[in-house]
Curated annotation (Swiss-Prot):
Family classification: Belongs to the NAD-dependent DNA ligase family. LigA subfamily.
Molecular function GO labels: DNA ligase (NAD+) activity; metal ion binding
One GO term of the biological process aspect: DNA replication
Keyword Transport on entry: no
Protein name: DNA ligase
Chain positions recorded as NAD(+) binding sites: D33, H34, Q35, Y36, D37, S83, L84, E117, R140, E175, K282, K306
SMART domains, alphabetized: BRCT (SM00292), LIGANc (SM00532)
Entries under CDD domains matching the protein: BRCT_DNA_ligase_like (cd17748), LIGANc (cd00114)
Organism: Anaplasma marginale (strain St. Maries)
Length: 673
């Protein structure tokens, strides 16, 4: 029995070593995180059951595997960057708390506060500062030595290069990751399996310009050798220094609240726009952290509460294709419905033709499907051991299934694309959905189903048609249609009217220009400040072979802007939209940071004469203010129009400053001058 256990341990270590090399060394994992965790758990159970075989454990306390054939110099961390112990159940978390309390010899009435933070699914890094100046950025590597990625990290947006009032030597740690939106753009030109691999591969590019174009994000979560008393103080100071920190954090001494936070994050994670794979619980007191110390592999004062498996096995019934907003034709797996994490899944993305060929996916196969918060789940693997003789290879279409145009593959890309743009009905439909989305014009009540309804009835054919919808609906009785009533129609019309005032950055994003996401749209808007300036500059750009320089924007984004303005149909849509919308000027970062209302809470009440409530709200937000719906002790200013109501009375009772509309207009003008 003992010999069998020893052989099983050797086999598990061989598998773990193999997968660690693929994951940490080559950024090309063969198995999912869940499958890897199962191997780790099996090894732990084996060692618990047969403690005598631990002497044969030749792969213990391993943090990571150094990057193979690394082109980046290796550097040593100030302190080891250890991995975290995992918890998979509430009982595991309770055992962790019990273990910590016992180690610290706490009494039942003694308080043990936890910091509950999102566990980012990206690539760990450390940033070293000497005298407040950024001198080095490194990957985690094997936990003791990492790769020097300083040059590439310098283009990470928002990573401070200089800190005020910092310790002489400070090491800040965090995670580099990629938003889903940026990964989807990249997927057409690079063959990364997921956002985490894309982030790890992108930060290791030899060309810094490519790194910048990949639009990587980061979050900082700890500061080594700092003198702060708590993790809460560390996060606050990191934020004040200008680091990006995750604001979704809870500090509590009650395990019930920590678990409730975990459950809340688990159910809402799909709205984050990036991948997380659990919640990290840390002992808040840094003094307690020092007392607890670490094992060879992980700190004793923290644990990662991992999300449950989001994978399942089901039959691939068929493969269809769909056309996206930018013309990318994506193969979709039509599945035998399966419950994954409490959600019935019948469709999943196959990414592109290269992925189908690489995985050798065939119709009739048993496939492994992963759902990790994405809008469309993914086929991550094929179970070829159970493949029958009746499976069929998929033949990718040569023409667009929507408009019939011949599909093209641009140089350096893996995706096939329909280039008919707005004359392709499928692309036009997806652009309308994008246009009304939260970061676009944010039209409530005009979701995917409503848009498809109006498109199918010939009422919307392009984004410009949205603002003619009210007129077209006259004489049409929607009450007879399923899902529509007098109130829902009235609410929709009101929402469209309210959206007619829009900030320039939101408008640019809403157009759905390729490579122009939320961040890029903001950079463009801040550069040109007004719609007129932007429109004129882009038209001039199409008439020259020269390019323009917009701080923070890469060549692909500039070329995409130029291409968009080179299409006559797009210019016609812009002309129609600019006549119907009130596109507000964009404030510069300097204006937002230095304005008198930056960081202050403003409330509007009553009827405004010179602008809508939406326009006033956008004005305030563009200058860095926070707009609230109700007056409280935290309110800095109340702008009162005619018939102000109870908010005015409450403001007076709380000694909140109250001004009229004319004073507000003057305040905005002064802030922008």
């Amino acid at each position: 029995m003992l010999e069998q256990a020893r052989r099983r341990l050797a086999g598990l270590n061989a598998k773990l070593r193999h997968h660690d090399v693929l994951y940490h060394g080559l950024d090309a994992p063969e198995v999912t995180d869940h499958q890897y965790d199962l191997l780790v758990q099996e090894k732990k159970r084996l060692l618990d059951e047969f403690p005598d075989i631990s002497q044969y454990d030749d792969y213990a306390d391993v943090v990571g595997t150094p990057k193979i054939d690394s082109r980046f110099p290796k550097v040593q961390h100030l302190e080891p960057m250890l991995s975290l112990e995992n918890a998979f159940t509430v009982q595991d978390v309770e055992k962790f708390i019990t273990r910590v309390r016992r180690f610290l010899e706490l009494q039942p009435d003694d308080i043990l506060e936890l910091s509950c933070e999102l566990k980012m699914d990206g690539m760990s890094f450390s940033a070293l500062y000497h005298g407040g100046k950024l001198t080095r950025v490194a990957t985690r590597g094997n936990g003791h030595f990492g790769e020097d990625i300083t040059t590439n990290a310098m283009v990470l947006r928002g990573l401070p290069h200089q800190l005020d009032s910092a310790p002489e030597v400070l090491e800040v740690r965090g995670e580099i990751y990629m938003h889903h939106e940026d990964f989807e753009k990249l997927r057409g030109s690079c063959n990364f399996a997921n956002p985490r691999n894309a982030a790890a591969g992108s930060i290791r590019q030899l060309n810094q310009k490519i790194v910048e174009e990949r639009n990587l994000s980061y979050v900082a979560y700890s500061a080594v050798n700092s003198t702060f008393a708590t993790q809460q103080e560390i996060l606050k100071q990191l934020d004040e220094w200008g680091f990006h920190t995750n604001k979704q954090v809870l500090f509590t001494d009650k395990i019930e609240e920590a678990i409730a936070f975990y459950n809340s994050v688990y159910t809402t994670r799909s709205a984050l726009g990036y991948d997380i794979d659990g919640v990290v619980y840390k002992v808040n007191s840094t003094n307690f952290q020092k007392l607890l110390g670490a094992t060879g592999k992980s700190p004793r004062w923290a644990i990662a509460h991992k999300f449950p498996s989001t994978e399942a096995r089901t039959k691939l019934l068929d493969i269809t294709v769909q056309v996206g907003r930018t013309g990318v034709v994506t193969p979709i797996a039509e599945l035998e419905p399966i419950n994954i994490g409490g959600v019935m899944v019948s469709r999943a993305s196959l990414h592109n033709l290269n992925e189908i060929e690489r995985k050798d996916v065939r119709i009739g196969d048993l496939v492994i499907v992963k759902r990790a918060g994405e809008v469309i789940p993914q086929v991550v693997d094929v179970d070829k051991t159970l493949r029958s003789s009746g499976t069929q290879k998929f033949v990718f279409p040569s023409h667009c299934p929507s408009c019939g145009s011949k599909l093209h593959r641009e140089p350096g890309e893996v995706a096939l694309r329909c280039v008919a743009e707005l004359s392709c009905k499928a692309q036009a439909l997806e652009r309308v959905k994008h246009f009304v989305s939260r970061d676009g014009l944010n039209i409530m009540g005009l979701g995917a189903k409503q848009i498809e309804f109006f498109c199918n009835h010939g009422l919307i054919g392009s984004i410009a048609d949205i603002f003619s919808l009210e007129e077209k609906l006259h004489g049409i009785n929607l009450d007879t249609e399923h899902g529509w009533g007098e109130k829902s129609v009235a609410n929709l019309i009101a929402a469209i009217r309210n959206s007619a005032t829009v900030r320039l950055s939101n408008f640019i994003f809403a157009l759905g220009i390729r490579f122009i996401g939320v961040g890029a749209a903001k950079l463009v808007a801040e550069h040109y400040r007004s719609y007129k300036n932007w429109h004129q500059a882009m038209l001039a750009l199409t008439e020259t072979h020269d390019t323009v320089q917009i701080r923070g924007l890469g060549e692909k984004s500039i070329s995409s802007l130029k291409a968009f303005f080179s299409v006559q149909g797009n210019l016609e849509v812009l002309e129609s939209l600019s006549a119907k919308l009130n596109i507000l000027d964009e404030a510069s970062p300097a204006q937002r940071g230095s304005s008198a209302i930056s960081g202050k809470t403003v409330v509007f009440t009553g009827t405004l004469e010179s602008m809508s409530r939406t326009e006033a709200k956008l004005q305030a937000e563009s200058l860095g203010a926070k707009v609230a719906n109700s007056v409280s002790a935290n309110t800095w200013l109340l702008v009162a129009g005619s018939n102000p109501g109870s908010k005015h009375e409450k403001a007076l009772s709380l000694n909140v400053r109250v001004i009229d509309e004319q004073t507000w207009v003057k305040m905005v003008e002064d802030a922008r001058s």
